[in-house]
A protein has these predicted regions:
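Radical SAM enzyme core and accessory elements
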Residues: 211-297
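Conserved catalytic-core segments centered on acid/base and nucleophilic motifs
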Residues: 7-9, 18, 24-26, 193-194
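Conserved SAM/AdoMet-binding glycine-rich loop
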Residues: 24-172, 176-180
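Radical SAM enzyme [4Fe-4S]-AdoMet core and its adjacent flexible, acidic
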Residues: 49-78, 142-143, 148-149, 195, ...
Length: 297
């Protein structure tokens, strides 16, 4: 949907415009020295995709990063790094954070790793939000998102860099349930991934159709507009609730829905006492009976 808001070419504010706004913020009496987010929909993608784009515009039938990065892509973060350094150098500024909008697929195309180093050293406030959105490959294809392997590659690179610089910082991934193309099997696959990576999301996002997006076209038509092939869509509220519950299977309130989803998905092997199971065989642990004594005795 960003294409309809911004056009097919990445739109960026000039460094001068951003610095001018930062200077206004600094003058505020309540300013404590922290610029909370120099991000956006595509925070680190400020540079033209390639030299060809500068000459003839964007490609009509190709995307820069999906389904795989174009060989011509020029992943250059020098402009962004320069901007961040200028912001850090402003009098009165203690920290400049990037809290959202990092395109990790674009970041991983960088050859020298300068931006990842700069990001981890100066611009993460303990946690960095990123948006893999799912991990099942068929769902990611319908989303137009990079594959699970790209996400895991970034997770490893982020962890390695933080070890090198002696910092303890974390990634907060954002996932979506019930996206077009996401079956109950895919939802269970995501739940297992959350289990294996020790994730316990407090907030999850159920897919909401919004005007102007390919995902919404799939949701209402049941077809992929790019291939013409049928796409499974979750329309039933109860089915949507089951997919959402699987993402928060540790929440006791979701046990009944998770149990139903696992049975319907043919994954009763994930119900039991084993460490890999999502829920226990019984919904509630048996509690020892207590004998209440009268106050008079």
């Amino acid at each position: 949907a960003l294409t309809f808001h911004q056009g097919r070419r990445i739109q960026v504010r000039s460094q001068e415009s951003i610095i001018k706004e930062a200077e206004l913020i600094i003058k505020d009496p309540d300013f404590k020295g922290y610029i909370n987010d120099v991000g956006g929909p595509t925070a680190n993608f400020r540079h033209p995709s390639c030299q060809k784009q500068l000459k003839v515009g964007t490609c009509k039938h190709r995307q820069c990063l999906f389904p795989s990065p174009c060989p011509r892509i020029d992943a250059d973060h020098s402009d962004y790094i320069a901007l961040l350094r200028k912001l850090r150098a402003l009098p009165g500024v203690k920290k400049v954070f990037i809290r959202s909008g990092i395109r990790y697929d674009y970041l991983m195309e960088e050859k020298d790793g300068k931006f990842l180093d700069e990001l981890c050293r100066y611009h993460v406030s303990g946690q960095l939000k990123i948006a893999p959105e799912h991990i099942a490959e068929p769902v990611l294809r319908h989303m137009g998102k990079p594959g699970k392997d790209v996400y895991l590659k970034f997770v490893r690179a982020f962890a390695k860099k933080n070890r090198e610089i002696g910092k303890e910082q974390y990634l907060v991934p954002y996932f979506i349930s019930s996206h077009p193309g996401c079956t109950l099997t895919h939802a269970i696959e995501l739940a297992e991934f959350l289990r294996d990576t020790g994730r316990n999301p407090e907030q999850v996002q159920d897919f909401i159709p919004t005007p102007g997006s390919a995902s919404t076209a799939m949701y209402y038509s049941g077809y992929d507009p790019f291939t013409g092939k049928k796409v499974y869509t979750v329309q039933n509220p109860h089915q949507k609730a089951m997919q959402r519950a699987l993402m928060q299977y540790r929440n006791p309130r979701n046990r009944a829905l998770v149990r139903e989803a696992l049975k319907e998905g043919g994954r009763t092997d994930l119900i039991g006492e084993d460490s890999r199971c999502l829920i226990r065989e019984s919904n509630y642990r048996s509690r020892p009976q207590t004998i209440r004594r009268s106050k008079n005795k």
